[in-house]
From Swiss-Prot:
One of its GO terms (biological process) is positive regulation of receptor signaling pathway via JAK-STAT. Placental basal zone cells. GO terms for molecular function: hormone activity; prolactin receptor binding. This is Prolactin-8A5. The lineage of its organism: Eukaryota, Metazoa, Chordata, Craniata, Vertebrata. The gene is Prl8a5. Residues 1-30 form the signal peptide. Pfam families: Hormone_1 (PF00103). Keywords: Disulfide bond, Glycoprotein, Hormone, Secreted, Signal.
Length: 238
């Protein structure tokens, strides 16, 4: 499902980041040189970016698989088909659930080509932070629901764990690249948390519909950002 979140313009802005910030590569000069160890040179920052990019790719793949499974598995296929039909009919409640993402609040206001690397690194951290609470509660609620297939529950658990580890990687990278940087990690509550915890089955599936739809978009942003930031900060894999 394609979300109405101005994706083309946002991804266009990310691509502009590559071009417009090439002049900022001198920031890489302030990063400690690689550490010499037996067998060659070890660059901890490079390793952290490799880990972050790998986890971002894993998140993207898992979210795509989970999204498809919710539509195809007997556990949720009927509810997701009904919600999709209501979305097509532009039902106001379902339209919001299917097109508005909690993490959309983490996107900075566009300033054309004047994009700051530190700001986008913080934005990546915020995307992970915004996803942390919904994924945590998704695992709890799925574990308590009857008839949840192991394939769905295991993917939800893997998503939560990989997101948490990616958040740790990004926090570490920020402290190494911008040692004096400050970031306020105050993530607002997920709008659909009360729906997910509700005893009303329709409300619960509406929350799952919102989260699975948004994860499909958010994890692609994660992956794109990690590749661009890796290029700009380390000068590798450009």
């Amino acid at each position: 499902m394609e979300l109405a979140l101005s994706q083309p313009s946002f991804f266009g802005t990310l691509l502009m980041l590559v071009v417009s910030n090439l002049l900022l590569w001198e920031k890489a000069a302030s990063i400690p040189a690689c550490m010499v160890e037996d067998g060659g040179c070890w660059d901890p920052l490079r390793e952290a970016f490799n880990s972050a990019t790998q986890r971002a790719e894993t998140l993207r793949n898992l979210s795509d698989q989970l999204y498809v499974e919710f539509f195809q598995n007997q556990f949720s296929s009927r509810q997701f088909a009904d919600l999709s039909s209501q979305l097509i009919r532009k039902d106001e409640t379902v339209l919001k659930a299917g097109t508005y993402c909690h993490s959309n609040r983490a996107k900075p206001k566009s300033r054309g080509v004047n994009i700051d690397i530190e700001e986008y690194l913080k934005m990546s951290i915020n995307f992970c932070g915004f996803m942390d609470q919904p994924l945590f509660h998704l695992v709890i609620e799925l574990s308590a629901m009857e008839g949840v297939p192991e394939t769905i529950l295991s993917k939800a658990k893997d998503l939560e764990e990989n997101n948490r580890q990616l958040l740790d990687d990004l926090r570490w990278i920020l402290t190494k690249v911008f040692p004096t940087a400050e970031i306020k990690e105050e993530f607002p509550s997920w709008d659909y948390l009360s729906f997910l915890k509700s005893s009303n089955k329709n409300h619960k599936f509406l929350a799952i519909f919102n989260l699975s739809s948004c994860l499909d978009y958010d994890t692609q942003v994660h992956y794109t950002l990690s590749q661009i930031l890796n290029c700009l900060i380390t000068g590798k894999d450009c």
